[in-house]
Amino acid sequence: MEEDRAILTFHRIPSLNSSLITTSSPAKSGAEQFRRRVLRNPARGDFGLGRFACISLVEKCEQREFAPTTAQLLNNPLAILALVPKDAAIFAAGALAGAAAKTVTAPLDRIKLLMQTHGIRLGQQSAKKAIGFIEAITLIAKEEGVKGYWKGNLPQVIRVLPYSAVQLLAYESYKNLFKGKDDQLSVIGRLAAGACAGMTSTLLTYPLDVLRLRLAVEPGYRTMSQVALSMLRDEGIASFYYGLGPSLVGIAPYIAVNFCIFDLVKKSLPEEYRKKAQSSLLTAVLSAGIATLTCYPLDTVRRQMQMRGTPYKSIPEAFAGIIDRDGLIGLYRGFLPNALKTLPNSSIRLTTFDMVKRLIATSEKQLQKISDDNRNRDQAQ
């Protein structure tokens, strides 16, 4: 007997006249008609009639799933996507979009990192001679060749697969968490969801970010495992978390502003423009640009705190040291290549993610239509 099945037991009552509880059943045709009309799909049961009482028992069963046939799925291939768990589809979309975007923009990221960490790598006095954008491009080509522009990209891709996937999936989850009593998401709720998503993804993948930085800016070619073992042996496990504080502080407002502006601008567009890829792309560029301009100084601080031999132990100390040495402009070193990298990077991620969400919604509608058609056909028989 199934564990979730209802059980009805009868107990004899000695003092009760048995003639009062003799049961009778309706005619077979009547019972069959009852089953067809009342117990057709969602339930099963039986009933009895007697002089003492009339007992009717109906056991609820699972609703029948009018699953699509193979032929129906072949005729409506988009419906196959709806069979994949939604969270898994969003996770995969975020991972692939992030990896593609990072690989395309890897040369700009390498240039930015060299510009940001120039002073720490060469010593505080040498930092006065800031390396420029063109100079960084020339330096990489001269010393390392074309492949030097992608140095450190492998750990970056390995990191960005879970990072991007977790971030985008977490954002959707946090948005549901921060909805108000009216089931609406306020601006504050969107900002909070973005901040929490950014910190969650950063915390989970931070050691790979530090490893990627060391591979990108330290001289010579070494493998990921060689750099990781060197860090562990010379600096300890804590070296994988250098700069975590400013990273969390920096990523929280960046993702909050970026995602919030993207959502709000898309929401304000007329209905006919919301579903266009061009609208998503332009909105993503705008949101990424504002977020980058606002939060870039914290990125410079965290990068300098991640370096071996850094003199900075806290965020205020790093801010003061950079401003004292280079002025306010020092906080924006590498901003140009970062902007050139971040705008397409973030735009590709958000646009791809937005398109995949719409694709998932369309596939769910197709699958529902197939199920409804199957149900109507079954009931008509």
Swiss-Prot record:
Topologically, how does it sit relative to the membrane? Multi-pass membrane protein
State its location(s).
Plastid, Chloroplast membrane
Outline the Solcar repeats, range by range: 85-177, 185-268, 279-359
Specify where it is mainly localized: plastid
Q: One GO BP annotation here?
A: response to nematode
Could you name the domain of life of the organism this protein comes from? Eukaryota
Its keywords, alphabetically, are:
Chloroplast, Membrane, Plastid, Repeat, Transit peptide, Transmembrane, Transmembrane helix, Transport
Q: Where is the transit peptide?
A: 1-26
| PROSITE patterns linked to this entry | SOLCAR (PS50920)
Q: Which residue ranges traverse the bilayer?
A: 78-98, 154-179, 191-211, 237-257, 281-301, 334-360
Q: Please give the positions of the paired cysteines in each disulfide bond.
A: none
Detail which positions bind ADP.
Answer: 159, 302
- Entry annotated with the keyword Transmembrane helix: yes
- Protein name, UniProt field: Probable envelope ADP,ATP carrier protein, chloroplastic
Q: Which gene encodes it?
A: EAAC
